[in-house]
């Protein structure tokens, strides 16, 4: 069975490193070198189907290495077909990797989620006479506009309270975080969902400040802290494999052969885009769908071929791993 390489991340090192049997499937974790950087990998069957429950092993491996090294973390489940595939990644992305390693050197990520306690609304009702009056009137009438006005007043009061809390929270954290990224908020109870970039030496001070905040807002806010983590949200590099069927369908949509250049892809796309643009076919209900398919096909192939040899033959596509800028 062919042996692939499971990729965890990239570190700065001038010689091969071994980290023990801490990888997926208890595999040995080591580095594959290119000049002054190394890919942290473990051997794995090339057609191995990584199980979702092994994501925890992936995370633990990164955290273990992070104890003594700065590592650019890679997403879960990336398998290169062979060692040369990994070496090619390092060659193509060396300067991006080095710049990112410098940016996150000796730093870690801490995720903080802060939610309202369910008593906060009651506090606002008690403190705001105008809302109390509107609430009492709304209970006595079916007047919809009054209820809408009440809802707006409550939202405004909540927003004001949120701004007060956020100002205080950021003031107490001070300059301990070097950077922060806002994560998606999926419910109304969440006040803040953020990732903070913190110097390793200041980790405990950051935790102490969070404890100070938790104590201060004990019956008002709930704090959830996850970390320390590798700085996923503060690296601009993303590595992905491209699915052959996706690439092949895109090739066929544009009517291309298996060996193409980026200039050929551009030329064919421009011709097809002009020919099938929806503005030129106002009476065709499928024109927009056709144009979208052409545009999507171009984006797939442009991503694949921009910096690499453009062979769309099956084995070449399956061997290729893309190095891309993350989309914030």
Regions found by a protein language model. Give the residues of each.
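An interfacial alpha-helical scaffold signature
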Residues: 1-222, 228-229, 235-242, 247, ...
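Flexible domain-boundary/linker segments
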Residues: 114, 129, 223, 285-286, ...
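Short, surface-exposed helix-loop/turn micro-motifs enriched in polar/charged residues
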Residues: 186, 283-286
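N-terminal J-domain/J-like co-chaperone modules of DnaJ/Hsp40 proteins
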Residues: 236-280, 284, 293-328
């Amino acid at each position: 069975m062919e042996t692939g390489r499971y990729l965890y991340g990239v570190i700065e090192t001038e010689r091969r490193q071994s980290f023990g049997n801490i990888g997926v499937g208890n595999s040995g974790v080591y580095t594959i070198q290119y000049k002054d950087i190394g890919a942290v990998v473990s051997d794995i069957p090339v057609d191995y189907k990584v199980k979702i429950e092994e994501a925890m092993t992936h995370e633990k491996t990164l955290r273990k290495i992070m104890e003594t090294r700065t590592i650019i973390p890679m997403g879960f489940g990336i398998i290169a077909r062979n060692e040369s595939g990994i070496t090619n990644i390092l060659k193509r992305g060396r300067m991006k990797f080095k710049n990112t390693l410098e940016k996150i050197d000796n730093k870690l990520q801490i995720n903080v989620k802060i939610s309202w306690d369910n008593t906060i609304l009651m506090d606002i009702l008690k403190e705001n006479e105008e809302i109390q009056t509107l609430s009492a009137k709304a209970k006595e009438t079916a007047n919809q506009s009054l209820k809408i006005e009440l809802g707006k007043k409550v939202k405004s009061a909540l927003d004001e309270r949120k701004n007060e809390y956020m100002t205080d929270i950021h003031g107490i954290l001070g300059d301990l975080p070097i950077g922060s990224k806002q994560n998606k908020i999926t419910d109304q109870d969440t006040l803040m969902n953020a990732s903070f970039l913190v110097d390793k030496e200041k980790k405990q001070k950051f935790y102490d400040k969070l404890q100070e905040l938790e104590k201060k807002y004990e019956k008002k806010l709930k704090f959830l802290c996850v970390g320390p983590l590798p700085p996923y949200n503060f690296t601009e590099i993303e590595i992905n494999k491209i699915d052959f069927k996706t690439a092949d369908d895109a090739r066929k949509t544009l009517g291309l052969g298996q060996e193409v250049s980026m200039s050929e892809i551009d030329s064919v796309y421009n011709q097809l885009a002009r020919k099938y643009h929806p503005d030129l076919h106002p009476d065709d209900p499928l024109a927009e769908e056709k144009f979208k398919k052409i545009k999507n096909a171009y984006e797939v192939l442009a991503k694949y071929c921009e910096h690499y040899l453009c062979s769309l033959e099956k084995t070449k596509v399956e061997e290729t791993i893309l190095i891309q800028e993350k989309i914030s």
